[in-house]
Amino acid sequence: MQDIKQRDIEHVILVGCQVNREDEEFEQSIAELESLAKTAKGKVVGTITQKREKVESSTYVGKGKVQELVHLIEETEADLVIFNDELQASQMRNLHAECGIAVIDRTQLILDIFASRAKSREGKLQVELAQLKYLLPRLSGQGLALSRQGGGIGTRGPGETQLETDRRHIRRRMNEIERQLEAVVNHRVRYREKRKKNAAIQLALVGYTNAGKSTLLNRLTKADTLEEDQLFATLDPTTRQLHLPSGFSVLMSDTVGFIQDLPTTLVASFRSTLEELKEADLLLHVVDCSHPDYEQHERTVIKLIEELEAHSIPQLLIYNKADQKTDVFIPTHTKDSIIMSAYNEEDLLALKVKIEQALKGMMMPYRSIIKADEGHILAAARQETMIHTQQFDESREAYVIEGHALENTSIYSQLKERLLKES
């Protein structure tokens, strides 16, 4: 086994096999793998690709390409090889033997990035569960990847020696994590019930990783969440209050970014977090319109929203980073959309107006009269409904207010009882 000198930034070789994919789609996938490697603090020193009718069952790529890979490892003094598709345990074991350095796949790379990003207890548990589900059937091929001293890409998370040999330990730990996550889910359910009782409207930012969701959240709500030009900068959900032009307030949540071929173990482990989307009243789908693959990113997110059974929730399509877009960009017109930059104040105001218009479509209009001594109802209307006009009618000694409210709320019932009858 080659003695690997740990660097602050690991030298990485990427390997991809083009099977049943168009050239452009395959090139985009390899480019995204390079971005993922950079996010994980790796430096790509070489790339090997091969077009085949099917992958080689024993080594993923053909024998000639394996030899080419071995020579490239020696030439570049690479520390790690990352394959663009999920490897079987036998393939990983054979490739370790041929290469003499650590070998991981796209799934393990993404899990590794998630492990480095998780901050909350729930996020850390979800990542660990996903990693354990991935590792369990592959222990025999993971020896070199997990034994690298000082860690490195692919070793963050549950990399103890015990996990290599003790499957029972892994299963016990998985059961323990699932029990802990169940308690978190129950807490989420109670929180959602409380939120519904308080008639709070929930918006959820969704989108491909690095589309600018955190920047939008910060700029719209004046919050201070992590903003980085990196994939998966946000992992733990963040919720802030957003004040709309009418004065109406809603809750806005940032969510983990989606990505093409998101590992199934990750989707399963993060299901409790992702299912928060299903509780939203409006999805704000953010697309980086400056990215050359924006259409594919948009389709990937729509597909995942459908898989999470959240496609029936109204959506507003936000084409972000308009200040960086090229002439190639053509917006999709099947959904309500806005083209904007998160750093343009006029665009931010236009987005707030768009959000308000979308919410009006889900609410009931009212024009009610509230007596001067019914201050508690007026206060509730100001807090829980979207008021457009408010005037004091001296002849009636009452306030005449006009606006929109959610139908199944106590305040709307009270306002309905006080609807203004025109004389």
UniProtKB/Swiss-Prot annotation:
GO terms for molecular function: GTP binding; GTPase activity; metal ion binding; ribosome binding. It comes from Alkalihalophilus pseudofirmus (strain ATCC BAA-2126 / JCM 17055 / OF4) (Bacillus pseudofirmus). The gene is hflX. PROSITE patterns: G_HFLX (PS51705). Its cofactor is Mg(2+). Pfam families: GTP-bdg_M (PF16360), GTP-bdg_N (PF13167), MMR_HSR1 (PF01926). It is found in: Cytoplasm. CDD domains: HflX. Keywords: Cytoplasm, GTP-binding, Magnesium, Metal-binding, Nucleotide-binding. Monomer. Associates with the 50S ribosomal subunit. Belongs to the TRAFAC class OBG-HflX-like GTPase superfamily. HflX GTPase family. This is GTPase HflX. Mg(2+) binds at residues 214, 234. GO terms for cellular component: cytoplasm. GTPase that associates with the 50S ribosomal subunit and may have a role during protein synthesis or ribosome biogenesis. GTP binds at residues 207-214, 232-236, 254-257, 320-323, 341-343. Residues 201-363 form the Hflx-type G domain. InterPro entries: G_HFLX_dom (IPR030394), GTP-bd (IPR006073), GTP-bd_M (IPR032305), GTPase_HflX (IPR016496), GTPase_HflX_N (IPR025121), GTPase_HflX_N_sf (IPR042108), P-loop_NTPase (IPR027417), Small_GTP-bd (IPR005225).
